[in-house]
From Swiss-Prot:
Keyword set, alphabetical order: Endoplasmic reticulum, Glycoprotein, Glycosyltransferase, Magnesium, Membrane, Metal-binding, Transferase, Transmembrane, Transmembrane helix
Stored Pfam families: Glycos_transf_4 (PF00953)
EC nos: 2.7.8.15
InterPro entries: Glycosyl_transferase_4, GPT
Family to which the UniProt record says this protein belongs: Belongs to the glycosyltransferase 4 family.
GO biological process assignments: dolichol-linked oligosaccharide biosynthetic process
Residues binding Mg(2+), per UniProt: 215, 286
Activity control mechanisms: Inhibited by natural nucleoside antibiotic tunicamycin, which acts as a structural analog and competitor of UDP-GlcNAc.
Lineage: Eukaryota, Fungi, Dikarya, Ascomycota, Taphrinomycotina
Membrane topology recorded in Swiss-Prot or TrEMBL: Multi-pass membrane protein
Pathway, per record: Protein modification; protein glycosylation
Protein name stated in the entry: UDP-N-acetylglucosamine--dolichyl-phosphate N-acetylglucosaminephosphotransferase
Matches recorded under PANTHER family: UDP-N-ACETYLGLUCOSAMINE--DOLICHYL-PHOSPHATE N-ACETYLGLUCOSAMINEPHOSPHOTRANSFERASE
Length: 446
């Protein structure tokens, strides 16, 4: 009874915020995000059996009893997100669609004409291009879950999905310059450097990196949704710095748009994490990783903080750099690099890449790579005591890196460690952006 009343209260709060009397789009978006959380949490257990019947299912490899549970539940989160963002369109532009309620417009018969002339077509274009790019990458995720597309075939596809966004950015904003640090300006004799089309290549690279980087930190209950939730919260905090203390109109508008896109992501991710947390009752699938990563790339580009975004993605950058030897064939890469369950202790331990005993000797590139990474304490290598030949090494992932340094741990504790690391780097990024960067960059280029 108490739980039912609590749930009704959450639904009522979301609806009240959505239809707030002040017609504040931000408050309405907060309410919509609350409803997105409840809708995601409601739909997932109801559609799970249907997903299993259609073949969208899998077994949790890190459990003693490997039950079949529904997979690709990220598609439910993405669908709820898109429904919410479509519903939000008339809310965002309410004062232009219903001009009689806009106090800033004249009260005579010309109110409709004035409202039409003031309608922010550029904001609508940016909003719709963002949804189109996110939808395109979400479809890529669904296809990947269906057909298990190879990395070399899908790696660059998010850049194609970002084309609508980049075109709108080119037409409406066109900002391609970067600020030069004040200590370097006397030598370069300029405060700005115009990168031209190189800046668009950089933004395309951001669109490629964000979805893929979420996707390769995986294999543990809750880690994909958990890292995405922390990242989205940090991005929202970054936006609030500008919204609560606006320095200029352009910065306020850019970060409000970012908030409109990222708050519903927080809602649907929290709803998904409720069922993906250890012991997981659903798998998120590649769909969620691509969807969530693209939302973050989009808000970074439209919010003009794509460089700051990379500070928040430090764990993902570290994981990608650590994974390079296996991704590019310097060291053998197994099909799955997730940690292994010790059945006796119930704890997760490092997974290893085994080196074939029939291969004499190991390639020089492999020996050099594992030697360097071992000296940097990034991996553990086990050797044959009689010959000194490497027998196996831990897989090159941040999850195995954490297990290597902190030792075996329970699955949910490992996810908490990854989320904690994500939060610490997010706070570090906020400190760098809002307290250190102003000392180096006198002007804020939003």
């Amino acid at each position: 009874m108490i739980e039912s009343c609590f749930n009704v209260g959450i639904w009522a709060t979301g609806l009240a915020l959505l239809m707030n009397q002040g017609q504040s789009p931000l408050l309405s978006n907060v309410g919509l995000s609350v409803l997105a959380y409840k809708a995601t949490a409601m739909f997932i257990p109801r559609v799970g059996p249907s997903f299993i019947k259609r073949g969208f299912s899998g077994k949790d490899m890190n459990k003693v009893e490997k039950y079949v549970i529904p997979e690709t539940m990220g598609a439910v989160s993405a669908l709820v997100y898109f429904m919410c963002m479509i519903i939000f369109i008339p809310v965002l532009f309410y004062k232009y669609l219903v001009p009689n309620h806009n106090p800033n417009l004249p009260s005579d018969g010309s109110v409709a004409e004035v409202a039409k002339s003031q309608f922010p077509h550029d904001l609508l274009g940016a909003y719709l291009s963002a949804l189109l790019s996110i939808l395109s990458v979400s479809l890529l995720g669904i296809l990947d879950d269906l057909f298990d597309i190879r990395w070399r075939h899908k790696f660059f596809l998010p850049a194609i999905a970002a084309i609508p966004l980049l075109v709108v950015y080119y037409v409406d904003y066109g900002v391609t310059y970067v600020s030069v640090p004040s200590i370097v300006r006397p030598f370069l004799k300029r405060s700005l450097i115009n990168l031209g089309f190189l800046y668009y290549f950089y933004m395309a690279a951001v669109a490629i990196f964000c979805p893929n980087s979420i996707n390769i930190i995986a294999g543990v209950n809750g880690v994909e949704a958990g890292q995405s939730l922390v990242l989205a919260l940090v991005i929202a905090c970054n936006d609030l710095f500008y919204v609560l203390s606006p320095k200029n109109k352009d910065a306020l508008r850019a970060h409000l748009l970012s908030l409109y896109l990222v708050l519903p992501l927080i809602g649907v991710t929290a709803g998904l994490l409720k069922y993906n947390w250890w012991p997981s009752r659903v798998f998120v699938g590649d769909t969620f990783c691509y969807f969530a990563g693209m939302v973050m790339a989009v808000v970074g580009i439209l919010g003009h903080f794509s460089k700051t975004l990379m500070l928040f993605f430090i764990p993902q950058i570290f994981n990608f750099a650590l994974s390079v030897p296996q991704l590019f064939g310097l060291v053998e890469c197994p099909r799955h690099r997730l940690p292994k369950l010790n059945v006796k202790t119930g704890l997760l331990e490092n997974s290893y890449t085994e080196f074939s005993l029939n291969e004499h000797p190991l390639p020089k590139k492999t020996l050099l790579t594992i030697s360097i990474f071992e000296k940097l304490r990034l991996i553990r290598v086990e050797y044959d005591p009689s010959t000194g030949r490497p027998l196996r090494c831990t897989n090159f992932t941040i999850i195995n890196f954490v297990l290597y340094h902190l030792g075996p741990m329970r699955e949910d504790h490992l996810t908490i460690c990854i989320m904690g690391l994500q939060l610490l780097t997010g706070i570090f990024g906020l400190i760098i952006r809002h307290f250190v960067a102003p000392l180096v960059y006198p002007e804020d280029n939003i």
